[in-house]
Amino acid sequence: MIRVQQQDKNFTYISNIKDIDSLVNKEQPCWIDIENETNENIASLLISFGCHELAVHDVLKKNLPPKFEDFEGSIFMLYKGIGSVKENLDIKHVQMGFFVKENLLISIHEEPSFGIEAAKNNKDLLKWIKTPLLLLCKILDSSALKYLDEILQLDHVLAEFEDKIAVIGTDDDLTTLTAYKTRLRRLRRIANYHEKIIIEIIKFYDQRKLCAEDKHHLKDLHV
């Protein structure tokens, strides 16, 4: 599925990749969201918008760690988004690729993403689309807040769990505690990757002229 959101229009759903050129004005701000498309269609679309072949190759791979690349003034990044969440930090991650150009944000993912859906349904979306970097920040910020919310909820659960184990702990309790620790380590590893990416994005845009609002959102992501 390919969704196209331009500043002055509602979402357009494209079933035929060949229609993209006639529907998208490349001179106007635009967000193209690609979900669960074939590799052939993804590659064809990205190349038609001038995305670097190395980045196209990476975005089609599965289970790569988060990364950031600067390709001739545009950026490419891989990110671990949130697909779904079950109780006690049982998070299903979704690999997401982003291409950011002057007037364009392209997002690629195989499954629905919390950050994408949050941005798509936000009343300020048309404002954000004017600046692709701002839209990217909003998507990442929604994911980060969801991560934080889930961790805080687990913190409360762990506090009660530790009190219980201190009184009487069973083998099942220890197994559950080990599972919690494993999930937290995985999240810590992903968070470290994401922090490095945000630092690289800040460095990239520090060399360019940004308005105060965009700078604020970048710094806010890092914090």
Task: Put a short name on every predicted segment.
Residues 80-223:
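Extended amphipathic alpha-helical scaffolding segments in membrane-proximal extra-membrane regions
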